[in-house]
């Protein structure tokens, strides 16, 4: 699956990384002779990329391997590229995926950040406005909040207590948004403690760094 996904990116067939063999079959139908199905991916998001050419090790793309894990192995502080989370189009790209919008679904996507109650209220208001204009709307939520939304499509990333599951489901859910032909997507933010930065990095790219902050 990893080799096929690399081939997929070279051919520029799709924007979202495949996380199941069925995704590879869909994207590369007729272009490859065989798919070896090892089941869904165990992690979901791509690897951590680290720059060791500067005075301090720097994470250029966050992944499942966190800066804390790297610090324990390297025996020194590992810093994080400030352009990972903040939108900064002036920075010269140093790692794959930093320049191009690789993770975007077809529909416009917005991340809503804030307290749980404020996020639910704002997303429902935004959904209602879109539906009034005849749009089909998806909400990316969690198991804890999914029943609070009134969108046409509600997709759960899993429980906030299981950030590994959130990472596993991310690309599958973005793909489902395309398959369901939604017109707009609103997503909760996912500031989880361990790999939350990697998850948010991918979501921010998918949303083109479009974020609504609410209290």
PLM feature spans:
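A C-terminal functional module that forms or caps the active site or interfaces directly
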Residues: 91-208
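Short, flexible loop segments at boundaries between secondary-structure elements
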Residues: 211-215
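Short glycine-/acidic-enriched loop or helix-start segments at secondary-structure transitions
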Residues: 16-17, 45-47, 149, 196-198
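Conserved PLP-enzyme active-site core in the AAT-like
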Residues: 26
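Single conserved hydrophobic/aromatic residue that forms the stacking wall/gate
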Residues: 1-13
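Glycine-rich, Lys/Arg-enriched anion-binding loops that position phosphate/diphosphate groups
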Residues: 31-124
């Amino acid at each position: 699956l990893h080799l096929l996904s690399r081939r997929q990116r070279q051919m520029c067939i799709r924007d979202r990384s495949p996380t199941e063999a069925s995704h590879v079959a869909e994207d590369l139908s007729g272009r490859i002779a065989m798919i070896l199905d090892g089941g869904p991916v165990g992690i979901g998001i791509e690897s951590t990329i680290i720059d060791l050419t500067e005075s301090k090790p720097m994470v250029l793309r966050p992944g499942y391997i966190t800066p804390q894990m790297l610090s324990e192995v390297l025996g020194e502080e590992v810093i994080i590229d400030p352009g990972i989370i903040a939108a900064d189009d002036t920075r010269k790209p140093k790692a794959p995926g930093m320049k191009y919008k690789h993770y975007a679904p077809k529909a416009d996507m917005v991340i809503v950040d804030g307290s749980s109650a404020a996020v639910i209220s704002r997303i429902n208001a935004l959904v209602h406005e879109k539906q009034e204009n005849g749009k089909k709307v998806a909400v990316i939520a969690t198991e804890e909040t999914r029943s609070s939304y009134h969108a046409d499509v509600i997709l759960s990333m899993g429980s906030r207590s299981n950030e590994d599951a959130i990472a596993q489901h991310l690309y599958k859910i973005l793909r489902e948004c395309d398959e369901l032909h939604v017109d707009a997507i609103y997503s909760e933010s996912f500031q989880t403690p361990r790999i939350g930065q990697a998850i948010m990095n991918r979501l921010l790219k998918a949303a083109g760094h479009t974020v609504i902050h609410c209290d």
